[in-house]
Amino acid sequence: MKQYQTEAIVLRASAVREADRTLVLLTRDRGKLRVWAHGAARPTSRKRGAVQPFCRSRFLLERGREIDVVRQAEALEEFPALHADLEALALAGYVCELAEGFAAEGQAEPGIYGLLLQVLRRLAEDKSGLPVRFFEARILALTGFGPELGSCAGCGAQPVVPARFSPALGGVLCRGCRDRDPPARPCRSAVVQVLGKLLEWPLDRLKVLRIDAATGREVADILQACVCHHLEREPRSLAFLRKMGISSS
């Protein structure tokens, strides 16, 4: 099959020459794709709106020897609010970078696709940081890296009174195991409770959650440490958020 159709969210668009773009797409049925959009940046191009970052679009793609080519593109959902506000733009860029980092190439990713679409819709109206925490926790869980909260990640003891959290070991450590991973960070019971709700509650229900500033920072630090550990790097967009002083906690 030389041509095929797919629905995708544009994770990233990079300029090539004056009017061409290379795109990183996230699809339900084919996972992550890298494609070439010839002439997409021309003012008269019908593809132009459909290839913008964060846009949900329907694509007609043609297989190429090295990279597939966009033949047609139709925007289904454009999220103008995410482009109109620097903070929303930066947060959306961060979750899209995480989706790109965790999604498999050429393998169906319906869970990550649905999660990303849900969070982009929420970020268009809510920049509290909670949708981002929800995304971090859920994408870790979807890809098999969800934090272990109910038992000690060191010895398996249940129930566990958390003393520290270890991204490397994948969860909370009891007092007896707290020195097994020196980089592990202190972790209070209140933080574990919030992490549990992020993993269990639907996004709409989290609106009722009241989190004090200190707990919010600790939750953000733990989830971002997990993300960096499993990606084996710090996302560039996370560094940008910090540089710009944009709070994602």
UniProtKB/Swiss-Prot annotation:
InterPro entries registered for this protein in UniProt: ARFGAP/RecO (IPR037278), DNA_rep/recomb_RecO_N (IPR022572), NA-bd_OB-fold (IPR012340), RecO (IPR003717), RecO_C (IPR042242)
One BP annotation, GO: double-strand break repair
GO cellular component: bacterial nucleoid
Disulfide pairings: none
Keywords from the UniProt entry: DNA damage, DNA recombination, DNA repair
Family annotation (Pfam families): RecO_C, RecO_N
Role this protein plays: Involved in DNA repair and RecF pathway recombination.
Family: Belongs to the RecO family.
Protein name as it appears in the record: DNA repair protein RecO
